[in-house]
Amino acid sequence: MITSYFNKIEEILQIVLQKEENLLKQAAEKVAESIQNGGIIQLFGCGHSHLLTEEVFYRAGGLVPIKPILVEPLMLHEGAVRSSKLERQNDYADWFLQDQDLQANDVLIVLSTSGRNPVPVDVAAYGKEKGAFVIGVTSLEYSKSQPSRHKSGKHLYNSVDLVINNHSVKGDAVLSYEKVQVPFAPTSTVVGATILNSMFAEAIKRMADNGYEPPIFLSGNIDGADDHNQLLIERYQKRIPLLALDGDEA
């Protein structure tokens, strides 16, 4: 099973590279343009998709102007089943979206593998309303196999400006075994992290080629990194209070 899972991940990553590379380059260009023009990159996901928003936040070797939109009831630690029920509610997003600082120079990345639930669709719509460029990371196979739960009938893939297909299968689980009735071994997190990090790597190259110094964190466990990182935090913490070193600085 270990080899089978590695093989499946490698297979899907190759499919993503072959089929999504041009779209990833378009997304990277938008990310680079946003940062060069004073914008930030905001990310949102519910449940396990939210893990990807934290994967790229305050990350050694990662971009500094990254802001995860963290809504605790939609995460897992306040109740896993509850978070799923809330994600399915139409208009649930209204209460937290009104507090979000989304601007026209920003890029908003919304992550949802099934792409069928109302909250990610509403977040994408709000981003477009605010003038941000909205990217969706989702599975087209999964989305098109299941009806939308949104009152408009829309999925995430037809609610955004640009779609990156993570090529997860319906249900996200890729392995089976004759003694197990339910498929297992999801792929969306591994592939999603690769999608985001490759997109940002390309954006960094493009900024550098444009003569703009990319704002990148050094690992805090390398001597001398704190001074480098603190200067970047001070540049962005007004728009990304989560970057503040302690609660008083937020």
From Swiss-Prot:
GO biological process, one term: carbohydrate derivative metabolic process
Regions annotated as coiled coil: none
PROSITE patterns assigned to the protein according to its UniProt record, in alphabetical order: SIS
Record domain SIS: where: 31-214
Pfam families found in the cross-reference section: SIS_2 (PF13580)
Top-level taxon of the source organism: Bacteria
InterPro entries associated with the record: RpiR-like_SIS, SIS_dom, SIS_dom_sf, SIS_GmhA/DiaA_subfam, UPF0309
Alphabetized GO MF terms: carbohydrate derivative binding
Family listed: Belongs to the UPF0309 family.
Protein name: UPF0309 protein BH0227
Species of provenance: Halalkalibacterium halodurans (strain ATCC BAA-125 / DSM 18197 / FERM 7344 / JCM 9153 / C-125)
